[in-house]
């Protein structure tokens, strides 16, 4: 049996473009994609921290070091320039793989440069 686990996420990136009439997808700065391990054309989940909307699309590579996070096509109705988003991917893992799995977590600065990376989410305390 396979378990679906968080593969990676880019946390608190800022939307730089919302292009309704561009072919659908989400363009992501190539440096962020590489650090997170997101492949071009991979399915991504986008969670808009600003407005609470969630949607699924696919990633396209943006220019390295550009800071671009461009929500395109119909998904542009779900985000505005300046919104904070979390971009995540999931993968299916065998039990052995799941036991050893550590997600790739990339934390973004407000200009979409990398603040830091991690491979676990801190324990939430009351």
From Swiss-Prot:
It catalyses: L-aspartate + H(+) = beta-alanine + CO2. Signal peptide: none annotated. Pfam families: Asp_decarbox. GO terms for molecular function: aspartate 1-decarboxylase activity. The keyword Cytoplasm applies. Binds 1 pyruvoyl group covalently per subunit. Its cofactor is pyruvate. It is found in: Cytoplasm. Substrate binds at residues 57, 73-75. Keywords: Autocatalytic cleavage, Cytoplasm, Decarboxylase, Lyase, Pantothenate biosynthesis, Pyruvate, Schiff base, Zymogen. GO terms for cellular component: cytosol. The modification Pyruvic acid (Ser) is found at residue 25. Is synthesized initially as an inactive proenzyme, which is activated by self-cleavage at a specific serine bond to produce a beta-subunit with a hydroxyl group at its C-terminus and an alpha-subunit with a pyruvoyl group at its N-terminus. It is an enzyme of class 4 (lyase). Its EC number is 4.1.1.11. Belongs to the PanD family. Catalyzes the pyruvoyl-dependent decarboxylation of aspartate to produce beta-alanine. Heterooctamer of four alpha and four beta subunits. HAMAP family: PanD. This is Aspartate 1-decarboxylase. It comes from Acinetobacter baylyi (strain ATCC 33305 / BD413 / ADP1).
């Amino acid at each position: 049996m396979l378990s679906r686990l968080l593969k990676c996420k880019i946390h608190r990136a800022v939307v730089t473009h919302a292009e309704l009439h561009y072919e659908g997808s989400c363009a992501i700065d190539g440096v962020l994609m590489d650090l997170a391990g997101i492949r071009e054309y991979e399915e991504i989940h986008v969670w808009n921290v600003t407005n609470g909307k969630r949607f699924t699309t696919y990633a396209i590579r943006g220019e390295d070091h550009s800071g671009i996070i461009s929500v395109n096509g119909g998904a542009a109705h779900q985000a505005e320039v300046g919104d904070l988003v979390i971009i995540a991917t999931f993968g299916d893992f065998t039990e052995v793989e799941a036991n050893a799995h550590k997600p790739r977590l990339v934390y973004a600065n407000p200009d979409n440069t990398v603040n830091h990376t991690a491979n676990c989410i801190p324990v939430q305390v009351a």
